[in-house]
Design a protein with these regions (language model features):
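Positively charged, helix-rich recognition surfaces that bind polyanionic ligands
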Residues: 32-40, 45-257
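Acidic carboxylate diad motif detector
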Residues: 1-42
Length: 257
């Protein structure tokens, strides 16, 4: 459902694109910067065509900047990202959840249509458009959030979690937040702002360590333990906030090593 051309086989002038010997009108979402190296045309499940351009631009190196640092723990209880301080939390819209009833209805209508009929094709198209809307909304939010975080922080620390394992355990919630896609976008955006993204090893016991005295509490391995009191220094911890603080501390240690 896609094909590519190198710089010889394509050209763009205004809103006209030449692919091989054919010319097509297209909607230009933004101006093309640099020299086109590869052009890819993709067709989505709705039957619409999209043009993706890989361009060569003069390299401008942005040095890492100084500024505020933050550590985030991935949340599943109504918050996408949990920070050491409540005011820095990120509450993400659940785009799939909002469209779930409409998607379920469209799925039922699709399943009742006779195979290979026009009605079935129309029902399939309606369902595909709903899924595409959810995907586009989530992606737009991820880009916006990545830019906001990179403008605000010079260092952003995350735990390098096994997303496939999380998906098996939490399913729709992990898919709806799109953690993996967000991290990919964040790592792409960060260098443009001089922001550094640091990943802490997934086996680092961020939830079990007391962020005040570094006491390790093995009882916190149980995910049902949401709050706990450190037996050593008696500090009361919220599981996710304590983990976020430990992720920040470990990320800064990695950065300075």
């Amino acid at each position: 459902r896609s094909f590519s051309y190198n710089e010889v086989g394509c050209a763009i002038k205004g809103n006209i694109i030449r692919i091989a010997k054919n010319k097509y009108k297209f909607f230009k979402s933004r101006e093309v910067e640099g020299k086109i190296k590869v052009l890819t045309v993709k067709r989505d499940a709705c039957g619409d065509f999209y043009v993706y351009l890989a361009c060569e631009t003069p390299g401008v190196k942005i040095e890492p900047r100084l500024g505020k640092s933050i550590g985030f723990d991935f949340g599943l209880k109504g918050k996408m990202l949990v920070a050491p301080n409540k005011e820095d939390d990120v509450v993400a819209p659940s785009f799939f959840k909002k469209k779930q009833k409409a998607i379920a209805k469209a799925s039922r209508e699709f399943s009742t249509k006779r195979p290979h009929s026009n009605n079935r094709r129309r029902a399939q198209l309606s369902l595909a458009r709903l899924y595409r809307k959810v995907t586009n909304q989530r992606k737009a939010y991820h880009w916006q959030l990545a830019r906001e975080l990179c403008q605000k922080y010079a260092v952003i620390c995350f735990e390098d979690l096994n997303m496939e394992r999380m998906h098996r355990g939490y399913g729709k919630k992990v898919s709806d937040y799109g953690f993996s896609e967000f991290l990919r976008i964040l790592e792409y955006v960060a260098p443009q702002f001089g922001t550094r993204v640091v990943k802490v090893d997934r086996f680092y016991p961020s939830s079990q360590l007391c962020c005040e005295c570094s006491y390790q509490n093995p009882r916190v391995k149980d995910l049902s333990v949401r709050e706990w009191v450190c037996p050593s220094c008696k500090t009361h911890h919220d599981r996710d906030r304590n983990a976020a603080q430990n992720i920040l501390d470990e990320g800064l240690r990695i950065l300075s090593a």
